[in-house]
Regions:
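Active-site diphosphate/adenylate-binding microenvironment
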Residues: 9, 14, 27, 32, ...
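Phosphate/pyrophosphate-binding active-site segments
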Residues: 134, 170, 192-193, 289-376, ...
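Hydrophobic, well-ordered secondary-structure elements that form the walls
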Residues: 292, 361, 374, 413, ...
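N-terminal alpha/beta PP-like core and its mobile active-site loop of ThDP/TPP-dependent enzymes
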Residues: 1-327, 364, 448-451, 468-471, ...
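Active-site nucleophile and cofactor-binding loops and adjacent substrate-binding regions
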Residues: 24-26, 44-54, 69-76, 131-132, ...
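Thiamine diphosphate
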Residues: 112, 444-536
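Catalytic phosphate/nucleotide-handling subdomain of diverse soluble enzymes
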Residues: 406, 410-448, 454
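Short glycine-rich, flexible loops that bind phosphorylated cofactors or substrates
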Residues: 276-278, 381, 528-530
Length: 553
């Protein structure tokens, strides 16, 4: 049976379980778009290709499936770069399909020709330029397999226009599934023996737990052993914030109890965490006087940032189950007494105004089917500190790259991935201005995202860092001229309101929840608000910066 390359592309996407793609057309990808008309796959036309990449990312994070974004050659493809880098650093399975100029024109500086495979090599798990029509089917199959198996990540497939139009003898190609990597039994036994002897153990859960769908296995292990649990920014949701074993987020803006527990621990069981600099602070003090057991699917991560006493590479579920069988509970009451003497997640750290808005949302959202997406900056840290996330894939944020503008398009993708849920995008005014045009996409497709914009007329985290590190020499941290984001949303036909008190925000979210349509809420806050606790730059994770109240508000 002969099919055009474009028809094969649509067929493979459908067979791989793709129901929705996010994209923006252009000349080099038009044959694919022509074939897509006859396909059952839903196409969402975004306002910008970066929005398409973030939406595919949000779709993947919310569903656990591969997200797909489409762009044409040249500027269309390069506009995907930030989104692909975001997915790469957070290990998100995304397949990006880009059009390319005809094969005979490649290397001749043709109109809208760029070497997108060369550009994206450092920020994709793998990428392909399809040079022969007969390679199209196996390449697409391999792209999906690579994106989702092992450590997930983005894969780009660059398809020349004449490959899309070529008639190809279609042959079904199915790749053998990769078998889960079993953990080394001797290392598991050594880890279990160390856990059994530890007097001050802590489990650290990272984003790898959620990527592996291993959150229940991690929970069963920590409950059996009654071990305190802390999470990285990306691990939020792996263990419910309402569980007594959960101490909070650790890191440079981590909870005091969580950071102190990590500092005082004699053993850290790290599950799916990269130990990046935002988690560890000063590295030598982080690992001093403790044994670190590091579980990860990717051997390249073990001992990369922190030397582990015991490193175990393998399937996360299999490794956690093996540890649960081998490790035994023992008396940790004195350790828990010490932990409970430190300030907890609900204790205030300074005279902060902004966290009250986030705390006010918890009673409204508890036990509801919701997803939170964020941009990057102060609001992201306040949300991570004060929202009580209950489940995996309920918290979607850009942790590795720290991409401003991620939240709104990611919310679009997440809402389409899980229509039964309600997605709430939380942004600052700076990040929202970067991708706020995706309100067009949300409105035109009636996607019921609730967008909350915290407006301090500036770049709050930059202001905070300039306060701490540059003696209040404020530069380029103000966004002069008030923008009324409620009126901006109204221009797209989206209803909204202002909520300048925590109770008003809670009421506005409850109101928006009841109407199954897009809604925007603007919250104006004092630009002097600080994210606290804050670890002093270059110091250990329990070396907190102290502020006087007049510096905070």
């Amino acid at each position: 049976m002969q099919l055009s390359g474009a028809e094969i592309m649509c067929r493979i996407l459908a067979e791989e379980g793709v129901t929705t793609v996010f994209g923006y057309p252009g000349g080099a990808i038009l044959p694919f778009y022509d074939a897509l008309r006859q396909s059952p796959i839903q196409h969402i036309l975004t306002a910008h290709e970066q929005g398409a990449a973030h939406a595919a990312d949000g779709f993947a994070r919310a569903s656990g499936k591969v997200g797909v974004c489409i762009a044409t050659s040249g500027p269309g493809a390069t506009n995907l770069v930030t989104g692909l880098a975001t997915a790469f650093l957070d290990s998100v399975p995304v397949v990006a399909i880009t059009g390319q100029v005809n094969r005979a024109l490649i290397g001749h500086d043709a109109f809208q020709e760029v070497d997108i495979t060369g550009i994206t090599m450092p920020i994709t798990k793998h990428n392909f330029l399809v040079k022969k029509p007969e390679n199209l089917t196996p390449t697409l199959r391999l792209a999906f397999q690579l994106a989702r198996e092992g450590r997930p990540g983005p894969v780009l497939v660059d398809v020349p226009r004449d490959v899309q139009t070529a008639l190809i003898d279609f042959e079904e190609v199915r790749l053998a599934e990769l078998q889960p990597l079993e953990p080394d039994a001797e290392r598991v036994a050594a880890a279990a023996a160390a856990i059994n002897k530890a007097q001050r153990p802590v489990m650290l859960v990272g984003g790898g737990v959620i990527n592996a769908n291993a959150e229940y296995d991690a929970m069963h292990l920590c409950e059996k052993l009654h071990i305190p649990v802390v999470s990285t920014l990306m691990g939020i949701g792996a263990i419910s914030a309402y569980r007594q074993l959960f101490l909070g987020m650790t890191g440079l803006h981590g909870h005091e109890r969580a950071n102190n527990a990590v500092k005082e621990a004699d053993l850290i069981l790290a599950v799916g965490s990269r130990f990046n600099d935002r988690v560890t602070g000063e590295r030598s003090s982080y690992s001093a006087n403790k044994l670190i057991i590091h579980l990860d699917i990717d051997p390249a991560e073990v001992d990369k940032n922190i030397d582990s006493g015991i490193g175990i590479t393998g399937d996360m579920v299999a490794t956690l189950n093996a540890l649960e069988k081998a490790a035994q509970p023992h008396d940790l009451s004195s350790w828990w007494d010490k932990i409970n003497s430190w300030p907890g997640m609900d204790d205030d750290f300074g005279n902060e105004e902004a966290p009250k808005f986030f705390k006010a949302l918890n009673p409204v959202l508890k036990d509801k089917d919701y997803i939170i997406t964020t941009d990057v900056g102060q609001h992201q840290m306040w949300a991570a500190q004060h929202l009580k996330i209950q489940f995996a894939r309920q918290w979607l944020t850009s942790g590795g790259l720290g991409t401003m503008g991620f939240g709104l398009p990611a919310a679009l993708g997440a809402q389409l991935a899980r229509p039964q849920s309600r997605v709430i995008s939380i942004s600052g005014d700076g990040g929202f201005k970067m991708t706020g045009s995706e309100l067009f996409t949300i409105a035109s497709n009636n996607v019921p995202v609730i967008a909350i914009v915290f407006n301090n007329s500036g770049l709050g985290m930059i202001r905070q860092l300039q306060t701490v590190q540059f003696a209040k020499r404020f530069t380029a941290c103000e966004l002069p001229g008030y923008v009324d984001f409620v009126k901006y949303a109204a221009a797209f036909g989206i209803e909204g309101e202002h909520a300048d008190m925590p109770e008003a925000l809670a009421q506005a979210v409850a109101k928006a929840w009841e109407c199954r349509k897009p809604y925007l809420i603007e919250v104006c806050i004092n630009p002097k608000n600080m994210v606290l606790p804050m670890v002093a730059p270059g110091l250990g994770i329990n070396d907190f910066v102290k502020f006087a109240n007049d510096e905070i508000n």
